[in-house]
């Protein structure tokens, strides 16, 4: 009896070592390591923890053998009980466990698990076939997922791709990370016997609850049905599409890049110079003096400007800031004067009201050049010459006469003091035209 008990105890330890020490894929050729070593250790640890002592697998083996062999009735009681049960004549086991390598138990029931875990040769082959079918289904689902991703917008495809790792990573990492400890201990076979990852965040049959899967799978599950919505702002704020750019008008449109009045507000120095020249020519052609323009600006627009200010504007002698402020007002005045040329307007009335002396005559540049050339020939023309010259230049006779008078006074101012210019007597016709204060004064006796 002692020998039989010791043999049975050795049978227990050796059979347990055969079951648990055999490497994956050693029971069946071509299995290709259908389980990972980490999964086996975790499953065995779950079985040990659920049954409460380290010989739980061995006890389950004895239970199966006692029913299958028909030898001893009390074989499943423990170490000593196993020895007592093995004393029958009909025991199918020999003293050496290696004597009958073909006899293996078919079913081992995990008492702490949800269902039965198969460890027989046929069961292992069946599990291998199931896993191959699951892998094929996963490949088909991945192909469908890729087709769906090709139909999505680019930002949704990128969003979904960041949260879909490979099936192997989810089988080993996601299930171990998201299952609670009690669930992992009681359901040891669940970690590797059932898949924990499918496309679009759906779990396999009998898998973990839907609330335990990764938040990235929830986002990916929602995206196919709501592809037209933006990604979740809390999970992926950087995936939101950028705001659309502001609309731009045609290239030549002033409102496309800047304010429509920016050219008038900040003109360049070249623009100011060209406008001042154009303004002076238009003012002279319309027959308005600088004082008339300043008075008209004060009456029409509320800004009174003197004749000196208008003169300095035309001569570009104001500061750049003041030139920029005065330019739009003068431009408006020019537009109104051009539109009302040829008929008496409010500008003419305003100029007449403010005019206390004879209107200052403005002479164009071309007319002034003709008068200047005639002055060089004859500084003091006769009345007949003045009349003919006024008719040829379409000017009044009084205007021509006053111009020659003013020109002679200008020539005298240009004469250096204490002497006369060379040929001055020839120009002015002797000393009879010389003013009295230019004569030789005798000292007082």
From Swiss-Prot:
Cellular-component GO terms for this entry: nucleoplasm; nucleus; transcription regulator complex
Cellular localization per UniProt: Nucleus
Segments of skewed composition (Basic residues): 227-237
GO molecular function: DNA binding; DNA-binding transcription activator activity, RNA polymerase II-specific; DNA-binding transcription factor activity; identical protein binding; RNA polymerase II cis-regulatory region sequence-specific DNA binding; sequence-specific DNA binding
Compositional bias ranges of the Low complexity kind: 125-151, 163-173
DNA-binding feature ranges: 356-415
InterPro entries xref list: HD, Homeobox_CS, Homeodomain-like_sf, Lambda_DNA-bd_dom_sf, POU, POU_dom, POU_domain_TF, TF_POU_3
Segments of this protein annotated with the region Disordered: 64-173, 203-269, 411-445
Ranges of biased composition (kind: Pro residues): 239-253
Name of the protein described by the UniProt record: POU domain, class 3, transcription factor 2
């Amino acid at each position: 009896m002692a020998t039989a008990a010791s043999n049975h105890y050795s049978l227990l330890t050796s059979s347990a070592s055969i079951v648990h020490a055999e490497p994956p894929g050693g029971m069946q050729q071509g299995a290709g390591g259908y389980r990972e070593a980490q999964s086996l250790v975790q499953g065995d640890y779950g079985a040990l923890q659920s049954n409460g002592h380290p010989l739980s697998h061995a006890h389950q083996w004895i239970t199966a053998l006692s029913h299958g062999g028909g030898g001893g009735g009390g074989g499943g009681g423990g170490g000593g009980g196993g020895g007592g049960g093995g004393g029958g004549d009909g025991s199918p086991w020999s003293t050496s466990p290696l004597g009958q390598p073909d006899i293996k138990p078919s079913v081992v029931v995990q008492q702490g698990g949800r269902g039965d875990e198969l460890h027989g040769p046929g069961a292992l082959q069946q599990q291998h076939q199931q896993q191959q079918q699951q892998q094929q289904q996963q490949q088909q689902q991945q192909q469908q997922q890729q087709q769906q991703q090709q139909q999505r917008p680019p930002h949704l495809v990128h969003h979904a791709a960041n949260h879909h790792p490979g099936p192997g990573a989810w089988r080993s990492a996601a299930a171990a990370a998201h299952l609670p400890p009690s669930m992992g201990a009681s359901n040891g076979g669940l970690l590797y016997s059932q898949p924990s990852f499918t496309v679009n965040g759906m779990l396999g049959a009998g898998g973990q609850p839907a609330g335990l899967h990764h938040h990235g799978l929830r986002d990916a599950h929602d995206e196919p049905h709501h592809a037209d919505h933006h990604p979740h702002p809390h999970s992926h704020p950087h995936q939101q599409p950028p705001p659309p750019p502001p609309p731009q008008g045609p290239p030549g449109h002033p409102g496309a890049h800047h304010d429509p009045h920016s050219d008038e507000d900040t003109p360049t120095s070249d623009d100011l110079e060209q406008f001042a020249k154009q303004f002076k020519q238009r003012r002279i052609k319309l027959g308005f003096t600088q004082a008339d323009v300043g008075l008209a600006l004060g009456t029409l627009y509320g800004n009174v400007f003197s004749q000196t200010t208008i003169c300095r504007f035309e001569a570009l002698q104001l500061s750049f800031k003041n030139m920029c402020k005065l330019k739009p007002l003068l431009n408006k005045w020019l537009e109104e004067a051009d539109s009302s040329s040829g008929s008496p307007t409010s500008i003419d009335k305003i100029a007449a009201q403010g005019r206390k002396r004879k209107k200052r005559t403005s002479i164009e540049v071309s007319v002034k050049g003709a008068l200047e050339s005639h002055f060089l020939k004859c500084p003091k023309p006769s009345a007949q010459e003045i009349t003919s010259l006024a008719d040829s230049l379409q000017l009044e006779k009084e205007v021509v006469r006053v111009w020659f008078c003013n020109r002679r006074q200008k020539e005298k101012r240009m004469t250096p003091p204490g002497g006369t210019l060379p040929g001055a007597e020839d120009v002015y016709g002797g000393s009879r035209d010389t003013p009295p204060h230019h004569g030789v004064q005798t000292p007082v006796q």
